[in-house]
């Protein structure tokens, strides 16, 4: 046991690229339900940046668009 180090190996994960920056899209449309659904879980929660890979600017815009779509009943707040 001498000489063994008890520790976890650190994995280098590839940094996710913001999909909105890659597409060079101007604004995130709250009426585009198919695009917004990719960033919402089955339970209706908004995916965090570290999972979705969005930059801070687009994550804020995405959150506003999802909340706006929920308020006008385009997206559900929760599932059944």
UniProtKB/Swiss-Prot annotation:
Superkingdom to which the source organism belongs: Bacteria
GO CC, alphabetical: cytosolic small ribosomal subunit
Alphabetical list of Pfam families matching this protein: Ribosomal_S18 (PF01084)
GO molecular function terms noted in the UniProt entry: small ribosomal subunit rRNA binding; structural constituent of ribosome
Keywords for this protein: Ribonucleoprotein, Ribosomal protein, RNA-binding, rRNA-binding
PROSITE patterns registered for this protein in UniProt: RIBOSOMAL_S18
Disulphide-bonded residues: none
Signal sequence interval, chain numbering: none
GO biological process, one term: translation
Cited HAMAP family: Ribosomal_bS18
Subunit structure: Part of the 30S ribosomal subunit. Forms a tight heterodimer with protein bS6.
Family in the record: Belongs to the bacterial ribosomal protein bS18 family.
Database matches in PANTHER family: 30S RIBOSOMAL PROTEIN S18 (PTHR13479), SMALL RIBOSOMAL SUBUNIT PROTEIN BS18M (PTHR13479:SF40)
Protein name: Small ribosomal subunit protein bS18
Species assigned in the record: Clostridium botulinum (strain Hall / ATCC 3502 / NCTC 13319 / Type A)
